[in-house]
Amino acid sequence: MKQHTIRMIETNGIRLKVVVEGSGPLLLLLHGFPQSGYLWRNQIDDLVAAGYQVAVPDQRGYGGSDKPAEVEAYDLLQLSADAVGIADALGHETFTLVTHDWGAIVGWHVALLYPQRVNAVFALSVPPTIGTPVGALTRQENFGDNFVYTVYFQRPGVAEAELDADVRKSLRMLYYSVSGDAPAFGFMRAKPASSKMLDGLVDPDPLPSWLTEEDLDQYCEDYRDGFRGPINWYRSIDRGIGLTRRLQQTKITQPSHFMIGSLDPMNVLLAVPLANVEQNAPNLRGNVVLEGAGHWLPIERPKEVNAALLDFLAGLKSAPQSASITKG
């Protein structure tokens, strides 16, 4: 496992563990759930070689970063401020965001909240979700008697008890279940609302080619304090929607690129935002579906992701555009 330079950056009232490599324009790589900065292990070297400074945090609640206990510490305003604080600490006025999953949700909001700081956004798996109603993802009545993990995560202590019981097994099953190697959309297969997160999911044996025991060693280290911090992001969904209500009619006008796997469960859970991605990000330079890929594009399909990312970045150099924010 390659060792990278690590900085502990104090910003926004917390300390964040950030891998920092290279020099040049700043790329800020934001992971989602249940990951850590280690998600981007296949991207860092290629981006540094292309002439960029790369900053890869364990976001708050994750890995080697601080993990506030309060749910209120994980709203979108604070998560967005963390990203800007990293850029400030590294001396960059502007930066480009490279994001995945929850990192994409944060990245889209950073682009809206700090339009003059964000040059561009390259997002994987999750499109702009601006305008999602309060409760849309967190209230059981919206889903009948069907289990939905975003609702399950609202119950204090319940998900932690399940997932913390065997962290390695939990991660192994979660990573596999939303990948392109698992039965198509099996993660979204109907099960009763009384179910647990891992019920019905497959524990892979052997591991898929893109996930090694060494990788799991690192992830287990990153989750040594359990799942509470990461799950608190979900418990703050409605709080974040309320705090960013003023953004509901805004559009992301920075150059952007979106990519999703054809077998990613987000195709089901976020069908409406996916249908509106070009409307919500009118300066979209690419809207790509990787056939046969699942949710973990940076590790399932690193070559395709890196090629698309480097091509997008090269296009920014040849045709720079100023960032702005508009309503419509």
Task: Locate each region found by the language model.
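A short loop-to-beta-strand scaffold at the N-terminal edge of the catalytic core in hydrolase folds
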Residues: 11-20
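Flexible "cap/lid" subdomain of the alpha/beta-hydrolase fold that forms the substrate-access gate
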Residues: 2-4, 26, 62-98, 102-285
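Active-site loop/turn elements of alpha/beta-hydrolase fold enzymes
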Residues: 59, 126, 292
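Conserved HGGG/HGGXW glycine-rich cap/lid loop of the alpha/beta-hydrolase fold
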Residues: 19-66
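Short acidic-hydrophobic surface loop/beta-edge motif
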Residues: 5-11
